[in-house]
Amino acid sequence: MNIYIPDALRDLLPPSLLEQCQAQTFPKGEKLFHLGKAPEYMFFIVSGEAVLSRVSGQGEATILQRCKGGFLSEASLLTDSYHCDAIATRAGTAIALPIKAFRDALNYEDFSLKWIKLLSKEIMRLRTQSERLGLKDIKSKLIHLIQTEGSEGILALQSDYKSLASEIGVTHEALYRAIATLEAEGILKKSPQALCLLKPKAIS
């Protein structure tokens, strides 16, 4: 097999699925799949970034999930159609797995248990995200994001600040104001590529 497959994926998939892995490169802006289309592949993001997005009745795009590494389309595994669009926000590479073969492989106990464990971790991540979205003010949402998604008080940005605003459910103008306020209060330091909490213990 001449394509690169991350160790996490090699450890998860049975040999029958590993043999069917296909590498797919994507530029920024490309749609990996479309809302309403019948699922054909499961996607595992190896590099770059993609988001799950759905447009509301008012024409506003909502980011449902941001993926910088891992599976992107778990919710569509057993459905008749994709429930959203998958859009690349940074160019990269994905592993595409035929969805029918993926479904068939779940009949094997070892793989099905590994898949359940992976989904359990994803549920925990979504609960953390829901907790963050439930916070009332933007500063609290931003601090929560850095504390839960960053490392040692530093959140490295994988895209731009406009994408970050969508991730926490606010406008980018409101995000910039919140960052400016936190910087003025000496709580946070902003750089083009990262946000750093200067007083993590005081606000934890």
PLM region spans:
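Cyclic nucleotide-binding regulatory module and flanking cytosolic helices
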Residues: 1-28, 67-72, 77-79
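Short, small/polar residue-rich loop motifs at catalytic or cofactor-binding pockets
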Residues: 18-19, 37-39
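Short phosphate-coordinating micro-motif centered on Lys-Gly-acidic
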Residues: 31-37
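Glycine- and acidic-residue-biased ligand/ion/polar-headgroup-sensing regions
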Residues: 40-53, 68-70
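A short beta-strand-loop-beta hairpin characteristic of the jelly-roll/cupin
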Residues: 50-62
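Cyclic-nucleotide recognition modules
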Residues: 63-118
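Polybasic "coupling" helices that flank or enter modular domains
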Residues: 110-172
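Phosphate-/nucleic-acid-contacting segments
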Residues: 147-204
